[in-house]
């Protein structure tokens, strides 16, 4: 509970001119040997109406003098008790400290406010259950090097404590402490310093670590390699450059930059590299499935001109990384056919399908390549893109006329007939007559014989006229290039039509005339 006088003193900001020294003393607004006290704003005071101090600075002075009355007044004015304790320590005013010790939860909280080592150690001593290691830990934390120097002999003996303080100095980034410990007592392993510097992105500590290593005179190549791998993997250009000052392999940096898509790191060094090295990095980028931006960066330094196309294609296929092909295609460097050819020749239908999807290759293009390489499995699997069987047949049928190789046409005819055989009965009716003419045109005797049997199996009354017309049409299509097997099939069916008397006299004469021509072809 505040007294009425305390409430008045707390909120009194303007002192009347009529207040003399006696009145001010009675109000508790007078500081012996200093003069009147007046509050200014939230955190300053006015002494003798001409000297302005911060409330906390005044608290430190009052504490040093052991003036509890002024301390209480300044605490009313929202000063920080910690500054009064610091002042009391500087003036050895322990009676004042004891009056407020119940209000101090932990003297460690005061340590960050202390500037000199002597007061720092005295403050720490107020914490009853703390020992020397605790003091040294806080001295390290708050960069109190003189305290560490005072206990140098003890640190020289206690290796574990020394190593612990060194690690803490790294975590708290206390460079003076780090340098002093290493130069006076040495640390068994400096790796912790580099690891923390990298994790905190602290280039100053990292550089200091190499200075200390250099002073030892034993910078190992494996050490440099590890650091280059770590820093390049994180894209830390300045750390990489600092490491390279002491040696190391630039290829490690470039490999990591490609692997982790650090373009700024790559761009810095690419300008210095010969073309062959950049091409090797491009292959690595394909292998690691690098990002679009990384690939574009490498390609731009090659002017989108790749000399070793075969090697690039091998990497694209082996690592299933097609993005580089798309990027080159945008620059009118078309490698799709080459990629497709190698995939169709050497790999499964599933892998070909993956490449087709990634590079947006049309099914027709894939099927033509598969026909050229005699990969029936790929033709069949690719045709399943068209889910409707009739559509599959129509598309494959249209492709027959675009195939230049006879062996390719025969293979495609076999695939088409296989699809036809698996159709439902009603669906077969829709395509059988068209396919029969295709088979005749392509000299596919086996398939023609098979489909003619299917035509005969249909309802005679309904389909015989249509079948008769099919035979007549096929007979007209027969040329001297036709195979004898198809001619024999047609002869047999024409004889059957004569016997069944379903052919007109005019059609009969036409058949005889066509057969005569065919027979003459056979005898030539």
Swiss-Prot record:
Q: Does the keyword Transmembrane helix apply?
A: no
Among InterPro entries, the record links this protein to: MGF_505
Which keywords has UniProt assigned to this entry?
Late protein
Pfam families recorded = DUF249
Induction is noted as: Expressed in the late phase of the viral replicative cycle.
Per the entry, what this protein does is: Plays a role in virus cell tropism, and may be required for efficient virus replication in macrophages.
Family from the record:
Belongs to the asfivirus MGF 505 family.
Q: Tell me the protein's name.
A: Protein MGF 505-2R
């Amino acid at each position: 509970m505040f007294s009425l006088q305390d409430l008045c003193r707390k909120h009194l900001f303007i002192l009347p001119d009529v207040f003399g020294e006696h009145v001010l003393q009675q109000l508790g607004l007078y500081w012996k040997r200093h003069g009147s006290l007046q509050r200014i704003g939230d955190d300053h005071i006015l002494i003798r109406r001409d000297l302005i101090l911060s409330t906390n600075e005044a608290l430190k002075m009052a504490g040093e003098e052991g003036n509890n009355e002024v301390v209480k007044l300044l605490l009313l004015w929202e000063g920080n008790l910690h500054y009064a304790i610091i002042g009391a320590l500087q003036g050895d005013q322990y009676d004042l400290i004891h009056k407020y010790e119940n209000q101090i939860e932990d003297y460690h909280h005061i340590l960050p406010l202390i500037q000199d080592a002597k007061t720092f150690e005295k403050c720490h001593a107020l914490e009853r259950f703390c020992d020397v290691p605790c003091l040294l830990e806080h001295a390290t934390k708050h960069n109190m090097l003189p305290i560490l120097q005072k206990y140098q002999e003890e640190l020289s003996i206690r290796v574990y404590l020394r190593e612990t303080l060194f690690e803490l100095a790294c975590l708290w980034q206390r460079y003076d402490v780090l340098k002093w410990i290493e130069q006076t007592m040495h640390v068994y392993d400096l790796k912790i310093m580099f690891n923390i510097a990298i994790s905190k992105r602290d280039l100053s500590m990292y550089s200091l670590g190499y200075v200390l290593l250099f002073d030892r005179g034993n910078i190992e190549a494996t050490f440099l390699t590890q650091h280059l791998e770590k820093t390049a993997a994180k894209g830390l250009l300045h750390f990489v450059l600092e490491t390279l000052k002491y040696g190391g392999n630039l290829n490690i940096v470039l490999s990591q930059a490609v692997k982790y898509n650090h373009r700024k790191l790559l761009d810095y060094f690419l300008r210095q590299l010969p073309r062959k090295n950049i091409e090797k990095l491009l292959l690595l980028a394909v292998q690691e499935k690098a990002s679009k931006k990384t690939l574009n960066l490498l390609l731009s330094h090659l002017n989108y001109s790749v000399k070793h196309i075969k090697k690039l294609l091998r990497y694209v296929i082996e690592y299933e990384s097609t993005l580089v092909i798309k990027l080159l295609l945008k620059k009118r460097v078309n490698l799709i056919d080459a990629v497709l050819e190698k995939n169709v020749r050497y790999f499964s239908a599933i892998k070909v399908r993956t490449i087709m999807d990634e590079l947006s290759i049309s099914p027709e293009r894939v099927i033509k390549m598969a026909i050229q390489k005699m990969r029936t499995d790929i033709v069949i699997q690719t045709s399943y893109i068209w889910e409707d069987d009739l559509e599959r047949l129509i598309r494959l049928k249209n492709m027959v006329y675009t195939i230049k190789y006879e062996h390719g046409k025969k293979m495609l005819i076999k695939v088409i007939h296989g699809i036809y055989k698996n159709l439902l009965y009603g669906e077969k009716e829709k395509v059988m007559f068209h396919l029969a003419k295709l088979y005749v045109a392509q000299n596919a005797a086996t398939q023609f014989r098979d489909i003619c049997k299917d035509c005969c199996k249909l309802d005679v009354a309904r389909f015989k006229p249509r079948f008769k017309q099919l035979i007549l049409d096929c007979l007209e299509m027969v040329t001297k290039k036709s195979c004898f097997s198809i001619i024999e099939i047609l002869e047999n069916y024409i004889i059957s039509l004569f016997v069944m008397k379903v052919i007109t006299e005019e059609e009969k004469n036409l058949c005889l005339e066509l057969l005569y021509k065919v027979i003459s072809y056979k005898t030539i």
